[in-house]
Amino acid sequence: AADDKGQLMTFVEACRAWRAVHGELPANLTIFLEGEEESGSPSLVPFLQGHADELRADLALICDTGLFADRVPAIVTQLRGMLQEEVTVRGASRDLHSGLYGGAAMNPIRVLAAVLAGLHDASGRVTVPGFYDGVLELPEELRAAWAALEFDHEAFLGAVGLRHPAGEAGRLPLEMLWSRPTAEPNGIAGGYAGEGFKTVLPAEASAKISFRLVGDQDPQAIRESFREMVRARVPADAEVSFVGHGASPASRMDTSSPAFEAARRALSDEWGTEAAFVGSGGSIPVAGYFKSVLGMDSLLAGWGKDDDGLHAPNEKYDVESFHKGTRSWARVLAALR
């Protein structure tokens, strides 16, 4: 499927086809398959540090992105970082009968719901203290370049049954996706949610929250600030615990390198339309670690489409994307040799 085995095999097929035609690859390539991206890549940095001499290269090619608007080849030049937190609020020593204790005893679901509701102010800005430290406003030349892409915000939201943009007031969805940080509850649990009804005050409630980071935001500093904020917003007799999951900073590529322009021309030739430099709302930690540990930029290109259903049942990858993606990588390899 598109995220990401299909894309990996597209690159591998390009290498196989090149060798079948030319006898050897056009450059000294190291193929590196990293399978922990969805969990924050906890083993990646130690591995890169331990094998830096073997892995260091002029440039990394990463095949984990998609087409822009399903038709325009795109090279991703910036990625958001990621911070994942799990918080649990505990109250009574056991579940309580809501008729006997309701109104007198603390309800952890109410406490946690208030914390989650308070993550944003009325304008949509995140309220975690210091959250926007290191967040830069979008340069005007980049804003103009993105505007020239003519992204259809209404169609983007309409495709998933929505009409009104969320996020910070006054910012378009494309800006929110590519250049602004977010805080999003991803799941909440507590009490009884099974068949029928049980009138309980739960002993505990928990939630999973992810933060997408941009610019120079510090994941660890935000983690600590978030935890301090939660502790300050719960009642004195509530016990709060946290589990930290993945954490990785945002990353930006140096597009002044000749490799980026060479790849852009190669993709334009294959797809018959001008390739675009774009941002990405997603997080691919390995790109940032290639830069910080190995000192090399990453050229990110991919052939996924909006209807591929990433992270959903029946996720797919178009045959056209496989065939044209294979030829695209072959063109990029030829342009970079």
Label the predicted regions:
Residues A2, S93, F211-D218, S248:
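A generic structural motif
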Residues A104-A105, E195-A203:
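Short, solvent-exposed beta-strand/turn "edge" segments of beta-rich domains on protein surfaces
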Residues F68, T77, S98-I188, Q217-E239:
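Acidic-enriched catalytic cores of C-N bond-cleaving enzymes acting on peptides and small amides
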Residues D4-Q78:
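Acidic/histidine-rich catalytic neighborhood of metal-dependent amide-processing enzymes
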Residues T88, L112, N186, L201-A205, ...:
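Zn-dependent metallopeptidase/amidohydrolase metal-coordination segment
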Residues F211-V214, S241-S256:
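A short beta-alpha structural unit
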Residues A74-R90, L299-G304:
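Flexible glycine/proline-rich, aromatic-decorated loop/lid segments
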Residues P73-T77, G194-T199:
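Short beta-strand/turn micro-motifs at beta-sheet edges
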